[in-house]
Amino acid sequence: MKKQNLLQVTCTVAFGVAALAAESVRAQGSDELLRFSRYNFGIATARSAGMGGAYTSLGADGATMSINPAGISMYGHSEVGISPGLRITSQRADYSGSGGNVSNRLGNTKGNIGSFSMVYANGNFAVGFGMNRLADFNGRSRAIGYGEQFSIGDMFVEQLYGIPASNIGAPENDIYQAFFRYPPKLWGGILGYQAGLFDPVAGTGGPDQPSQQYTTQGMIQPGTLLYPELYRRTSGTVNEYTISGGYNFKDILYVGATLGIQDIYYNRFDTYSEATTVTNVGLHSLFYDQNLRMSGAGVNLKVGATVRPVPWLRIGVAYHSPTWINMSEEYDGAMTVFYTQPIAGYDYGFSDTPISRDEYNMRTPSRLLAGISATIGSVGIVSLDYERVWYQDMKYTSDGFQDINEGTTATPGIRELYGPTDMVRAGVEFQPVRSLFLRAGYGYSTSPYRGSEFRRYGEYQQWSGGIGFRNHRVNIDLAYVYGTTREMPFKPYSDTGSDGYPVTTDGTIYPRDKNHNLILSVAFKF
């Protein structure tokens, strides 16, 4: 079992899973808070997506209610629009460990409704209601290693040090008593003990006392090579429902505001497994399943203004307040351990947990957007956006999260892990003939992680293109968006040792995501 230095501690905390033995958010740290705070470029409408999302200074599109609400006052007519889409994700997971490197890739395809909008325009004033999908969590990944020397059971042994064996058994009259006695952080270890992955060390609890130390050597002989695998399936979205209003001052100054109400859900199913080639004694294989279900609602405010100093130029600015979120979660797990030879007449051991429920509040960072666009005669538009997001201001606002928010002597807090990001978006629209529009866009976001050694993780790039047909009654737009990012590496399992520093495996998983979005928008004017 490896003890890490402070740099590796930062990696383990920031790199995602933190501990497969403790998947509740209170045990994980700040990675889920980042997940619900980072939208990248969203999905939105086909017109805005085709232009790379560079829409801070533009308007008269359903996406403006979630970008710069001043754009709603640019509508010259009332409109109803919907944007269904198809999202294809490809997730690559490279496993690097003592046995070498292995690459694996899985894909996922899912249809969706990216946005919906209704706008009523009356002269200089417009109001609207809409829905924009800000984030999509649907995906699958698999990471496979080989020749590892450490087992997740070794982490569990360290995790349960000092806990009497009599407290973590499963008596027939109350099989879940151990789980109600200890927090979910220890549930993985309890599952391992009850399924027979490791044994108590006799005599470690004092005279006539139950053992308080454990060992895997009865199941995993020294020198045994392990073949770990982590399969992950995620689903969920962040949808934002918007109520917007805007006013147009003589086509020179446009102002607007949006009340955003977010609907959030996220599900994650993990199966971590280990297998050996041993046939005569001990462990044959283990399977550790975990389910995390999260749902919540949040509220925020957006305000914006756009000025048109000359007919061909627009300059826009918008501020997005933090989103205040109330989140609920459920977590449960199960473990099955298969033996090479029957133990007490059984070929395998099994244990599962009850459902752990928790509720807490969180705050996402604020955002500042600025954009400039120019009309090129009657044939085109060029638009450029800049966005700043202060991820160091993310925070859990409920009790019990002080160590995550502020850090400890062994683990860094949110302000040490995260910093501000800079995002640029650029888009062009060209009208070669009447009613036909061609579009292209690009976007780039810097990493939210602090430290030069981490900056290559979390960067996001996006390329897009689109085509549109528009007349006085209907708009039909189609866009294709391709995005790619390298996520923070993480350990397949990790926990804090008795000295306060993480104890973990040799293996590290390096995820890379690619996604393809096809968006069709149809809007009717009246």
Model-identified regions with their sequence ranges:
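Bacterial Sec-dependent N-terminal signal peptides
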Residues: 1-31, 526
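Low-complexity, polar-biased intrinsically disordered regions enriched in Pro/Ser/Thr/Gly
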Residues: 3, 94-105, 494-507
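Short secondary-structure junctions and interdomain/linker hinges
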Residues: 17, 58, 76-79, 252, ...
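Outer-membrane beta-barrel porins/channels
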Residues: 28-42, 48-49, 121-526
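Outer-membrane beta-barrel translocator/receptor signature
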Residues: 46, 58-67, 72-150, 239
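Residue-level detector of conserved, well-ordered beta-strand and adjacent loop positions
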Residues: 52
